[in-house]
UniProtKB/Swiss-Prot annotation:
It comes from Salmonella arizonae (strain ATCC BAA-731 / CDC346-86 / RSK2980). Pfam families: UPF0181. This is UPF0181 protein YoaH. Belongs to the UPF0181 family. InterPro entries: UPF0181. It comes from the Bacteria.
Length: 59
């Protein structure tokens, strides 16, 4: 379970996707781009936060 994930509007999600695509077009790997944008979102987000739980289906 992860606490404190930013709750993003559709517009904010779209901007994040566009930022990831921009970084990838500059030669960054997808994983690095996602990690960088996630860090930027966490650092700059001032809205609500959600609690999310991810379960591994292989168990």
């Amino acid at each position: 379970m992860f606490a404190g994930l930013p709750s993003l509007s559709h517009e904010q999600q779209q901007k994040a996707v566009e930022r990831i695509q921009e970084l990838m077009s500059q030669g960054m790997s997808s994983g690095e781009a996602i990690a960088q944008v996630a860090g930027e979102l966490r650092a700059n987000h001032t809205g609500e936060r959600i609690v999310a739980r991810f379960e591994d289906e292989d168990e």
